């Protein structure tokens, strides 16, 4: 290591995923010790094993406090442009009964703690991430946003997780382009302060943010947004004229208003929306819809002539809900790719069993289908698939996904009959396993 160019060594040290290794390097080599002052990135994570050792009577006296390690590392690296400090996700499983109520050794959004190190590095800091220990932070309201906004004029990316945040004293941060708040209790019920103080945001991620009442996102430069909302807010509004990618998950808002004319990639998961108002999407190419009332949502959706790639699913399937596959093409007539989730498939197959599949010209434009099957009666399922194949004359690819706990014998008997019925189609079948499906056979 001593023979490497200093610039390369600094780059290697800056890329370490755990900056505790940087401290070990300082002890191992005089050269490394001198070069650590030029490190540009600092990442320190409190692991579950470290936490347990710090609590055990046998080992706690031999464990250096986490905050002390961090302060020492910051003091040895004054040129930092990226800082990430947090607790490992495994600490979420720690019980409240196992924690001293007055402990603050892992209360990382404590303003007193942050004041010890932030002023030393704020001049060059471009990215800051703090992931707090919820058990210690949930009952302590933090003024850290005010401190960060007063110190870090050049900050471009900010991420805070697992904390109770006040917006009192928050100053505008005009250079901040990316903000992530995850599992946060936020004292900004309408998001007015977020809109006012972060006007240049291009990326906004709000995941499990509580304390919201009537939130409105009003950001002129926003391009990408992830927003998962609890059932508390009665209305949700997004005004973002430059937004191109939106992933929105909510429960039952009485009002959902979207003014996002440039949206091209949209994932919407909503149990029910009484009032869903959107302006027509002229650029929307990729759409993912999930709802407990899929038919009602489709009825409220504006014409989606630009949509080419479409995914639909029903969150809570019941036999009384009537979702016809043809209804999709009344709203999205130019879709060439269709992914049908298991709930939507059940509803559509149930409607087919009662009344068949109506002709739609748009069905003839479909090129690819991914069907997440739930097979109750193999003959009904086959009849539904065959009817789809008859109507979709330009279909070239069809994938059938089965439940991982399903009947493999059923699947193996269904596949040969499908391929024999329509050999012109390229067939695939596989198993649904979380976000990534397992393909058992490709190009049958």
Residue ranges of model-derived segments:
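Short, loop-centered acidic/histidine patches that primarily coordinate divalent metals
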Residues: 343, 371-374, 391-393, 400-405, ...
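A structural signal for leucine-rich repeat
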Residues: 119, 143-152, 169-176, 192-199, ...
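C-terminal region signature
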Residues: 426-444
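Conserved hydrophobic beta-strand positions in leucine-rich repeat
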Residues: 42, 83-85, 128-131, 156-160, ...
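Structural alpha-beta junctions
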Residues: 121-128, 153-154, 333-336, 390-398, ...
């Amino acid at each position: 290591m001593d023979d490497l160019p200093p610039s390369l060594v600094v780059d290697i040290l800056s890329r370490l995923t755990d900056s505790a290794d940087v401290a070990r390097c300082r002890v191992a080599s005089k050269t490394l010790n001198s070069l650590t002052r030029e490190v540009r990135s600092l990442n320190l994570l409190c692991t579950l094993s470290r936490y347990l050792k710090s609590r055990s009577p046998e080992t706690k006296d031999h464990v250096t406090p986490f905050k002390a390690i961090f302060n020492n590392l910051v003091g040895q690296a004054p040129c930092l442009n990226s800082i990430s400090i947090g607790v490992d996700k495994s600490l979420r499983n720690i019980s409240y009964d196992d924690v001293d109520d007055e402990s603050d050794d892992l209360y990382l959004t404590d303003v007193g703690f942050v004041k010890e190190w932030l002023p030393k590095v704020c001049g060059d800091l471009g990215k800051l991430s703090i992931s707090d220990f919820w058990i210690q932070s949930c009952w302590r309201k933090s003024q850290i946003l005010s401190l960060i906004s007063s110190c870090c004029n050049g900050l471009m990316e900010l991420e805070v997780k697992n904390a109770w945040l006040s917006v009192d004293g928050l100053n505008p941060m005009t250079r901040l382009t990316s903000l992530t708040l995850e599992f946060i209790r936020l004292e900004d019920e309408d998001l007015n302060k977020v809109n006012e103080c972060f006007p240049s945001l291009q990326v906004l991620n709000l995941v499990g943010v509580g304390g919201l009442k009537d939130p409105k996102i009003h950001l002129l430069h926003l391009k990408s947004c992830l927003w998962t909302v609890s059932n508390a807010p009665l209305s949700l509004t997004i005004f973002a004229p430059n937004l191109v990618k939106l992933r929105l998950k909510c429960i039952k808002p009485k009002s959902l208003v979207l003014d996002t004319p440039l949206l091209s990639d949209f994932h919407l998961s909503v149990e029910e929306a009484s009032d869903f108002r959107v302006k027509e999407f002229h650029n929307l190419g990729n759409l993912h819809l999930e709802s407990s009332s899929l038919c009602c949502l489709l009825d409220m959706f504006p014409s989606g002539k630009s949509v080419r790639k479409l995914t639909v699913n029903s969150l809570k399937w019941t036999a009384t809900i009537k979702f016809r596959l043809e209804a999709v093409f009344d709203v999205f007539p130019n879709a060439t790719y269709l992914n049908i989730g298991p709930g939507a498939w059940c509803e559509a197959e149930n409607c087919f069993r009662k009344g068949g599949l109506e002709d739609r010209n748009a069905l003839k434009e479909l090129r690819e289908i991914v069907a997440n099957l739930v097979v109750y009666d193999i003959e009904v399922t086959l009849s539904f698939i065959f009817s789809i194949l008859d109507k979709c004359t330009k279909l070239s690819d069809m994938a059938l996904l089965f439940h991982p706990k399903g009947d493999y014998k059923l699947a193996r008997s269904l596949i040969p009959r499908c391929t024999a019925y329509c050999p012109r189609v390229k067939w695939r079948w596989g198993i649904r396993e979380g976000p990534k499906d397992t393909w058992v056979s490709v190009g049958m």
